């Protein structure tokens, strides 16, 4: 009976010391360490405004609400993933539509194609175990004239985007490269 760790956290003495330092400082959410992290991420990524939050789930809820998700709007998610992906859709007021995976455990592009309706506002592919989803094929699909013709914007943000939003979740693929 062999145990193979799927996603073990890296916690050394330095990580522990930083956590203890943060706890002792009295700032555990929006303090100076978070601000420094936001600035560092901004420098590395070349992004002007960075906002760190507590989890990907909270970020997904914010993104879906920013998108203008309404009750009855559909968001395509993989059937093989952590429940937080579908829960974020529910918490944002939408309806998750689950699509099966392929042999690499990532969401099926053909399944996405078959699941898209006039109510589809977003797709949340989830990269599994360091293997990114086929974003080229997903983006080609959502940018195709046939799929864009199905898309009906119901918010200013959706109007500007002009297509279904693709919101990537790479929770178990940090450090993986696509392309």
Can you describe what each PLM-predicted range is?
Residues 171-175:
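Short, polar loop motifs at secondary-structure junctions
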Residues 1, 176-179:
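Short, intrinsically disordered, charge-balanced linker/junction segments flanking boundaries
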Residues 65-170:
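PLP-dependent aminotransferase-like
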Residues 1-28, 32:
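N-terminal "arm"/small-domain region of PLP-dependent enzymes with the aminotransferase-like
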Residues 27-74, 88-91, 98, 146, ...:
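Phosphate-binding glycine-rich loop
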